[in-house]
């Protein structure tokens, strides 16, 4: 029993075995053991799964870590019993042992030799202004992390199709993988797989590069003939824009810098087929965005907010995202994740508004909001920060008795500090194990204009933690942790 959690209420009803996970007939993804959870109707009952005694909480919830069923009996045998009653359930599942080894996998490959010109999602070619929400995702390998966020209409060289992915070349030194549906070519023909022949490419000419400033950002403006492939990389106090397959020469293409308190230095250089713009900043990177508008690539480097040390949150715009629906994890007694995350999110809103924050909610009802719409809401609100509220669950094969607690997630480096301050504030409020801060490629953490994090306050599949988050007092604790973490984060920007 965790003394930091509210007491689990007692339930003593008729025995009724209800398995929540795995779902009936589902394929169990683990190799030899897995968790099974649900409820039995009475906290006074004992429960065995395939002869293994598993714990039952006072509210009748159970969670067991048991061996997978053997190949010749693809089910769990559950027996719940009290002094006066017994209930049995044969619960069917599937395991790897039961379905046999996977057949060898051979990908479907189409190789182009020589490579051919391709346009990334050319349905956007008629537009002269790009939206940062409409990008093509690039990876270093078919299953790799997202590293490139390319403009629609970018011209690349198509090297091969592999199943639903396409390998394209940004310049002779850089191949990446994109979704095959994002690639449009005039002619597609299958040829035998050979090494692509080298082909002379026409470089995009950088016509002019200059800088400008506003109250919100310092902007790099690079005039080019068409949308180039690019990548933005960042350190703690520096940011670099690399334009692939470009050439900048002559006085007209030199960077015209400006004097600005955010910029320590600004340089332009050339490396092989690339034009590189590097900015050393006087303060840590807070946010940025990359646009292609009217023939100009814009890198906007966001200024950190002006913060009152006495009231660090006042005047900020913060987007609160109660995680899910349409999907979400479910606990042993049937509590669905979107229900308590909304309750916590609304409490976060109220606490933030009391501190002078303009709060934008991604949802205030049970109606589903698409995952991709949530960061769009935040960017269009010009948010100063984004926090998504979730409840965790283990993957098949992970023992939840060993792996549970509180953790936070980020994707871009400028969000790591926010993830840490929120975690530091949540752990004492919730009283659970500190799992740490994790780098992970999550959709709601990918925006670059503002720090964005996702909080997994607890594990809803743990019976005592599921019972706790049903209570208003524990929802309050989660909300306080989020708000205190946000306040600590913005206090670091106070002068």
State where each predicted segment sits.
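Extracytoplasmic/secreted envelope proteins and their assembly/folding machinery
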Residues: 75, 342-349, 372-375, 416-423, ...
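Soluble non-cytosolic domains of exported or imported proteins
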Residues: 140, 144, 150, 335-343, ...
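Sec-exported extracytoplasmic/periplasmic mature domains
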Residues: 161, 346-357, 379-383, 414, ...
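Solvent-exposed loop/turn segments at secondary-structure junctions
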Residues: 325-327, 365-369, 391-397, 413-416, ...
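Active-site-adjacent mobile loop/cap segments within catalytic or ligand-binding domains
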Residues: 385-388, 395, 407-410, 436-495
